[in-house]
Protein backbone atom coordinates (compact mmCIF):
# COMPACT_ATOMS: atom_id res chain seq x y z
CA UNK A 1 0.00 0.00 0.00
CA UNK A 2 1.14 3.52 -0.73
CA UNK A 3 4.00 2.57 -3.08
CA UNK A 4 5.60 5.72 -4.50
CA UNK A 5 6.73 6.15 -8.11
CA UNK A 6 10.33 5.95 -6.84
CA UNK A 7 9.68 2.69 -4.99
CA UNK A 8 7.99 1.21 -8.03
CA UNK A 9 10.98 2.18 -10.20
CA UNK A 10 13.32 0.54 -7.68
CA UNK A 11 11.25 -2.64 -7.98
CA UNK A 12 11.43 -2.50 -11.78
CA UNK A 13 15.20 -1.92 -11.68
CA UNK A 14 15.59 -4.89 -9.33
CA UNK A 15 13.50 -7.12 -11.61
CA UNK A 16 15.68 -6.14 -14.57
CA UNK A 17 18.91 -6.65 -12.60
CA UNK A 18 17.90 -10.10 -11.35
CA UNK A 19 16.36 -10.99 -14.73
CA UNK A 20 13.26 -12.74 -13.41
CA UNK A 21 11.61 -15.07 -15.89
CA UNK A 22 8.51 -15.80 -13.81
CA UNK A 23 6.67 -14.03 -11.03
CA UNK A 24 3.32 -14.29 -9.36
CA UNK A 25 2.25 -10.66 -9.45
CA UNK A 26 -1.02 -9.06 -8.52
CA UNK A 27 -2.55 -5.78 -7.40
CA UNK A 28 -2.33 -5.18 -3.67
CA UNK A 29 -5.53 -5.79 -1.76
CA UNK A 30 -5.86 -5.64 2.02
CA UNK A 31 -6.11 -8.95 3.84
CA UNK A 32 -7.95 -8.90 7.17
CA UNK A 33 -5.67 -9.31 10.17
CA UNK A 34 -2.44 -8.34 8.37
CA UNK A 35 -0.32 -5.30 9.33
CA UNK A 36 -0.70 -3.87 5.82
CA UNK A 37 -4.40 -3.22 6.43
CA UNK A 38 -3.38 -0.50 8.90
CA UNK A 39 -1.35 1.38 6.27
CA UNK A 40 -2.78 4.12 4.11
CA UNK A 41 -3.23 3.09 0.48
CA UNK A 42 -3.37 6.25 -1.61
CA UNK A 43 -2.42 4.68 -4.94
CA UNK A 44 -5.29 4.82 -7.43
CA UNK A 45 -6.57 1.64 -9.05
CA UNK A 46 -5.61 3.10 -12.44
CA UNK A 47 -1.96 3.45 -11.36
CA UNK A 48 -1.98 -0.01 -9.77
CA UNK A 49 -3.21 -1.57 -13.02
CA UNK A 50 -0.65 0.38 -15.07
CA UNK A 51 2.21 -0.70 -12.80
CA UNK A 52 1.09 -4.33 -12.86
CA UNK A 53 0.99 -4.28 -16.68
CA UNK A 54 4.49 -2.75 -16.83
CA UNK A 55 5.88 -5.28 -14.38
CA UNK A 56 4.28 -8.25 -16.13
CA UNK A 57 5.40 -7.01 -19.55
CA UNK A 58 9.07 -6.77 -18.52
CA UNK A 59 8.96 -10.21 -16.90
CA UNK A 60 7.29 -11.65 -20.03
CA UNK A 61 10.03 -10.11 -22.22
CA UNK A 62 12.76 -11.50 -19.96
CA UNK A 63 11.09 -14.90 -20.00
CA UNK A 64 10.95 -14.95 -23.82
CA UNK A 65 14.65 -14.07 -24.08
CA UNK A 66 15.50 -16.80 -21.56
CA UNK A 67 13.32 -19.37 -23.33
CA UNK A 68 14.96 -18.56 -26.67
CA UNK A 69 18.38 -19.10 -25.08
CA UNK A 70 17.34 -22.72 -24.46
CA UNK A 71 17.07 -23.46 -28.20
CA UNK A 72 19.56 -26.16 -29.20
CA UNK A 73 20.25 -27.23 -25.62
CA UNK A 74 19.62 -30.60 -24.01
CA UNK A 75 17.27 -30.52 -21.05
CA UNK A 76 16.30 -33.13 -18.49
CA UNK A 77 12.50 -32.93 -18.32
CA UNK A 78 10.14 -34.38 -15.73
CA UNK A 79 7.09 -35.42 -17.75
CA UNK A 80 3.89 -34.12 -16.18
CA UNK A 81 1.07 -34.98 -18.55
CA UNK A 82 -0.33 -35.29 -22.06
CA UNK A 83 -1.06 -32.13 -23.99
CA UNK A 84 -4.73 -31.23 -24.02
CA UNK A 85 -4.27 -29.36 -27.29
CA UNK A 86 -2.12 -31.67 -29.43
CA UNK A 87 -2.60 -35.43 -29.78
CA UNK A 88 0.61 -37.42 -29.21
CA UNK A 89 2.30 -34.53 -27.43
CA UNK A 90 3.38 -34.41 -23.80
CA UNK A 91 4.75 -31.68 -21.58
CA UNK A 92 6.99 -31.50 -18.58
CA UNK A 93 9.28 -29.17 -16.68
CA UNK A 94 12.98 -28.70 -17.16
CA UNK A 95 15.22 -28.04 -14.15
CA UNK A 96 14.74 -24.29 -14.72
CA UNK A 97 10.94 -24.77 -14.33
CA UNK A 98 10.26 -23.99 -18.01
CA UNK A 99 7.53 -26.10 -19.58
CA UNK A 100 8.81 -28.17 -22.50
CA UNK A 101 6.47 -29.74 -25.08
CA UNK A 102 7.49 -32.81 -27.08
CA UNK A 103 5.99 -35.65 -29.11
CA UNK A 104 6.20 -39.23 -27.92
CA UNK A 105 4.58 -42.54 -28.73
CA UNK A 106 5.44 -43.74 -25.23
CA UNK A 107 3.80 -42.56 -22.03
CA UNK A 108 6.56 -41.19 -19.79
CA UNK A 109 4.35 -39.40 -17.27
CA UNK A 110 6.25 -39.33 -13.97
CA UNK A 111 9.59 -40.11 -15.64
CA UNK A 112 12.52 -37.95 -16.62
CA UNK A 113 13.37 -37.76 -20.31
CA UNK A 114 16.23 -36.06 -22.10
CA UNK A 115 14.94 -33.55 -24.61
CA UNK A 116 16.76 -31.49 -27.21
CA UNK A 117 15.10 -28.10 -27.56
CA UNK A 118 14.34 -27.64 -31.25
CA UNK A 119 12.23 -24.50 -31.33
CA UNK A 120 11.04 -21.66 -29.18
CA UNK A 121 8.15 -19.50 -30.31
CA UNK A 122 7.63 -16.58 -27.96
CA UNK A 123 7.60 -18.41 -24.64
CA UNK A 124 6.58 -21.86 -25.88
CA UNK A 125 9.43 -24.39 -25.83
CA UNK A 126 9.34 -27.47 -28.07
CA UNK A 127 11.79 -30.34 -28.26
CA UNK A 128 12.43 -33.91 -29.26
CA UNK A 129 13.26 -36.80 -26.98
CA UNK A 130 16.83 -38.00 -27.27
CA UNK A 131 17.97 -41.36 -25.92
CA UNK A 132 14.43 -42.72 -26.25
CA UNK A 133 15.49 -46.39 -25.98
CA UNK A 134 17.20 -45.72 -22.67
CA UNK A 135 14.11 -43.92 -21.40
CA UNK A 136 11.82 -46.75 -22.52
CA UNK A 137 13.91 -49.28 -20.56
CA UNK A 138 13.81 -47.01 -17.53
CA UNK A 139 10.05 -46.58 -17.85
CA UNK A 140 9.50 -50.33 -18.13
CA UNK A 141 11.74 -50.95 -15.13
CA UNK A 142 9.80 -48.42 -13.08
CA UNK A 143 6.52 -50.10 -14.07
CA UNK A 144 7.85 -53.53 -13.01
CA UNK A 145 8.98 -52.18 -9.64
CA UNK A 146 5.52 -50.68 -9.07
CA UNK A 147 3.85 -54.10 -9.48
Q: What is each of the regions a protein language model found here?
A:
Residues 1-34, 54-65:
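Conserved C-terminal portion of the radical SAM core fold
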Residues 38-147:
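Terminal RNA-binding accessory module
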Amino acid sequence: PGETDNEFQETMDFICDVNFTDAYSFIYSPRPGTPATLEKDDVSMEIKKKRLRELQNIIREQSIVYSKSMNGTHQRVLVENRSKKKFGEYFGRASNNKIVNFKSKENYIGDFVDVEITSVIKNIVHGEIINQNFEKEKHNTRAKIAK
